[in-house]
């Protein structure tokens, strides 16, 4: 049964743009070869880490959203763990994802209510 997954991983900050694109392409290729569908990639860019990892204070954040059965998750994480370009990774299984719902939430303006009223 196919599930929706979200993976965020942090690449080393000293990688060039070409090396970042090669690393992302390598992981995308792995997923597509293993029958993952609806692969969406967002490269967030270099950001400050909450705490130092491997004596580095910055990292390049990348997000994958994809649909697959669970058999791709462990091999992909193993591949990232053994590679030297990934500092951290996290994969979560999403309960239910609907692109229409996500778009509606983004397009609806926040309702503002007065916090305090004059007495």
Swiss-Prot record:
Presence of the UniProt keyword Amino-acid biosynthesis in the record: no
GO molecular function: small ribosomal subunit rRNA binding; structural constituent of ribosome
GO biological processes: translation
Coiled coil: none
Feature: compositional bias, Low complexity: 109-119
Keyword check for RNA-binding: yes
GO cellular component: cytoplasm; ribonucleoprotein complex; ribosome
One Pfam family cited in the UniProt record for this chain: Ribosomal_S6
Stretches for region Disordered: 97-119
Keywords: Ribonucleoprotein, Ribosomal protein, RNA-binding, rRNA-binding
Family: Belongs to the bacterial ribosomal protein bS6 family.
NCBIfam families referenced in this protein's UniProt entry, alphabetically: S6
Function: Binds together with bS18 to 16S ribosomal RNA.
Protein name in the entry: Small ribosomal subunit protein bS6
UniProt source species: Crocosphaera subtropica (strain ATCC 51142 / BH68)
Lineage: Bacteria, Bacillati, Cyanobacteriota, Cyanophyceae, Oscillatoriophycideae
Gene: rpsF
């Amino acid at each position: 049964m196919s599930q929706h997954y979200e993976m965020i991983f942090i690449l080393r900050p000293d990688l060039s743009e070409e090396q970042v694109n090669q690393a992302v392409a390598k992981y995308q290729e792995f997923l597509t070869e293993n029958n993952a569908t609806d692969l969406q990639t967002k490269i967030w860019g270099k950001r400050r880490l909450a705490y130092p990892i491997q004596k580095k204070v910055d990292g390049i954040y990348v997000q994958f959203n994809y649909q697959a059965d669970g058999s791709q998750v462990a091999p992909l994480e193993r591949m990232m763990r053994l590679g030297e370009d990934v500092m951290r990774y996290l994969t979560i299984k999403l309960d239910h994802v609907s692109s229409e719902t996500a778009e509606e939430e983004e397009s609806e303006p926040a309702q503002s209510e007065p916090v305090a009223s004059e007495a």
